[in-house]
Amino acid sequence: MDELLSMLNFLGMKDPEELFSDIPKSVRKKSIGIGGGLDEYRVIDRAMEIGRKNKTDMINFLGNGIYDRVIPEAVNYILSKPEFLDSYTPYQPEISQGMLQSMFEYQSLISDLMGMDVTNASMYDGYSALGEAARMAYRINGHSKILVPESSYDSKISVLRNYIWGLNMKIMKYRIGEDGMIDLDDLSSKIDSDTSAIVVENPNGYGILDKNIFGVKDIKKDAVLISYVDPISLGVVKPPGEYGSDIAVAEGQQLGIPMNFGGPLLGLMSFKMEHIRRSPGRIIGESIDSNGKRAYVMTLQTREQHIRRAKATSNICSNQALLTLAASAYLSIMGSTGLRKVALLTIKHSRMIKEKLSSIGVKPYFSTESFSDVMFRLERDVMEALASKNILGGLKLRQLISDTPMKDATFFTVTEKTDAAAIEKLAAALEVI
């Protein structure tokens, strides 16, 4: 109290309220309602009390962008090391060799996974990576039209539209056929001399592993082919580099990053070497120092904080360096064999849920192979009823694509963690609600 009075006297004031005299009383709150101070034990007890309101034991069939994957404990151990957890953007790379090496290894791993030449040091998330890819396509050819599949979610298109605002670019949708895959004839009819980029998804927004992506390179003309992929699926399906992609992007949350109220996320972005000078973000390179020893450096960082704004390729600031470490640790621990097993288990469980729900009259929307997100025909809304039975699932496609004609399309998502018992419980619940 003596300290408070001393400070007020120094300021020529008598009451702390005078500090806020320039704020109109009509907008000031008398109390913020958090009560008085508590000792450490009571604070922890109160936090635990609030935390117990969360339901953490529910069976999860939700996905469509964020997935419940197994994360090896070693990933969390590596992330918790203070030299990684506490470090910031390495503005002085010569004293940040450990962080730069981890980012370099990440770039190498993702390039291998995508089958592409180069990977940047990360984007904020998958959707923003797609937006940056569209801007990159514009820098490559200067055209204004972007073709996206009608299976793209509203949220994805919203972010894409926000990124291309100001470039006078326009978005046009192309058709997905009755088999759940790209209608190549419809796509071909919409490609013209003004087409800047063609976006393909694999799996697409309907959850389908799309074999028709292999035909896009033959009809794309001089448009940039941008692939939006599921990184786990690359354990078994062909990578973007093998079907002619110029740029490949993905959401990397599944690579060792837990679900946490929708974030933080990790944008993966890879591309052909010929486009490296038009790429956004940073690229970490390997060089030799003055003593002839290996040194990691920031090879390219053409953001507007470093060069003239008119010549910058992005405005990305602190990238997702810690999360690139999570992805590197996850991929290194799992290896190609482990990643393949995870992908195969996911496909096995998608087939399992199709078979089980079909047996109770809930039919898959497509006979084509699905990956994690499996779409069924189900007229009624079941999310609330399932939640009352401790099951999360039943997301409607119309919640993701507002103008879809498939009003009965309903998702149930599986991962390697989904087991037969969980699917049995889901089927039993759907039979009675």
UniProtKB/Swiss-Prot annotation:
Q: Matching Pfam families, A to Z?
A: GDC-P
Q: Does the keyword Oxidoreductase apply?
A: yes
Give one GO biological process term: glycine decarboxylation via glycine cleavage system
Gene3D superfamilies cross-referenced by the UniProt entry = Aspartate Aminotransferase, domain 1 (3.90.1150.10), Type I PLP-dependent aspartate aminotransferase-like (Major domain) (3.40.640.10)
Catalysed reaction per UniProt? N(6)-[(R)-lipoyl]-L-lysyl-[glycine-cleavage complex H protein] + glycine + H(+) = N(6)-[(R)-S(8)-aminomethyldihydrolipoyl]-L-lysyl-[glycine-cleavage complex H protein] + CO2
Presence of the UniProt keyword Oxidoreductase in the record: yes
Keywords for this protein? Oxidoreductase
Give the multimer and partner information. The glycine cleavage system is composed of four proteins: P, T, L and H. In this organism, the P 'protein' is a heterodimer of two subunits.
According to its UniProt record, which protein family does this protein belong to? Belongs to the GcvP family. N-terminal subunit subfamily.
Q: Can you name this protein?
A: Probable glycine dehydrogenase (decarboxylating) subunit 1
What is this organism's lineage?
A: Archaea, Methanobacteriati, Thermoplasmatota, Thermoplasmata, Thermoplasmatales
